[in-house]
């Protein structure tokens, strides 16, 4: 849907919450205006929090706008706010973000987790720079094919390269270029198959 009103969005969320009718339901909103073309605005969040405070408990902010994330944290301290990318994660953490929900966590979970755990450490700014470099490189390629290609290489499992159209897998030359760029910043994905992790 495009060009929907705040009232319409509110009614949509309220209807689902009321029909489920279970206090165990927890809703995490997803603000991704570049893709959805329907923002989750502050007014809508205020209304949902007012009427469903035990249900609407968090938001993933994929606006790519650090100022928007900061304002969400400031306005809604009781809401778990998650930036949708790690590009400005340290700043968001220091302002009160709950963590990060990022596509590149599929390949850089260790780096992101290390930053979250070390947000107050002397090397936190350096850790932020490292994870931001990895993010910049990976997002300069078609993101999902790049991530799946890297997982295929790391796990030695070509099934990870399977992509549904209209997306297309990266060819070997582009995968080598991606790996070379990541090598240049000291990043190497080390992954274990699920059976080895147990």
Indicate residue ranges for each PLM-predicted region:
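Structured C-terminal cap/extension of enzyme domains
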Residues: 87-198
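Glycine/proline-rich, positively charged
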Residues: 1-80
